[in-house]
């Protein structure tokens, strides 16, 4: 409440998928950001709620569902910071070899497109909620994604209705040429 009175605009939670006890404690000890932001959503009404989630070590369906859920819980205040995860040590936590820089950004472009596509599987008016007529969802307004790309195969649709914002905000802070291209082609609308 104090933050909202102080015109605070966004709570942004970074994330790190690797614990290095030699690093600064803020990089080592972290709550999972979407869970924390969901709790914070119940005590705020205006502040945006942004979380970092990796496109290299996550899957698009789960990310789309989680941010759509946060958007519903918060009344349309969710934001996703899409990162490719530069720390090679993270790969060991997922039983895989860390992809090189170029490959991570190729994956990220497809990942972001799939997430946005899943958010768009539900038309704005798909949830009818007609008690008298006995119709809750208009199936003609819910569409499969049927994405089959180089890195991801996702059928869809998402199993949560359209987010209050339509699509939660997507952020990306990579400053390399690949990061700028990701923002230009896949993130900016």
Provide a role label for each language-model segment.
Residues 7-15, 49-50, 80-83:
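Short beta-strand segments at enzyme active-site cores
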Residues 185-189:
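Conserved small/polar residues in nucleotide/adenosyl-binding loops
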Residues 23, 59-181:
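Internal, glycine-rich beta/alpha segment that forms the wall or movable "lid"
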Residues 4-5, 38-45, 71-75:
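Acidic (Asp/Glu)-rich catalytic clusters
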Residues 25-49:
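Alpha-helix-loop-beta-strand connector modules within alpha/beta enzyme cores
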Residues 2-6, 182:
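A short, Lys/Arg-enriched amphipathic alpha-helix followed by its capping loop at the start of a domain
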Residues 31, 47-60, 99-102:
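Aromatic/His-enriched, Gly/Pro-containing loop or helix-boundary segments
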Residues 10-30:
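Glycine-rich, proline-tolerant flexible connector loops at the mouths of alpha/beta enzymes
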């Amino acid at each position: 409440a104090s933050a909202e009175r102080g015109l605070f605009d966004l709570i942004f939670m970074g994330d790190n998928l690797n614990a290095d006890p030699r690093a600064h404690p803020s990089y080592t000890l972290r709550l999972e950001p979407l869970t924390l932001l969901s709790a914070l959503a119940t005590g705020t009404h205006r502040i945006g709620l942004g979380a970092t989630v990796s496109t290299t070590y996550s899957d698009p369906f789960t990310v789309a569902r989680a941010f759509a859920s946060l958007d519903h819980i918060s009344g349309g205040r969710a934001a996703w910071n899409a990162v490719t995860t530069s720390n090679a040590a993270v790969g060991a936590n997922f039983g895989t070899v860390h992809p090189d820089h170029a490959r991570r950004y190729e994956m990220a472009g497809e990942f972001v497109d799939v997430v946005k596509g899943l958010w768009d599987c539900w038309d704005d008016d798909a949830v009818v909620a007609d008690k008298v007529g006995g119709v809750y969802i208009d199936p003609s307004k819910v569409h499969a994604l049927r994405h089959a790309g180089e890195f991801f195969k996702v059928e869809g649709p998402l199993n949560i209705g359209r987010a209050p914002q339509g699509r939660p905000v997507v952020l990306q802070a990579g400053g390399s040429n690949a990061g700028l291209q990701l923002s230009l082609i896949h993130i900016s609308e």
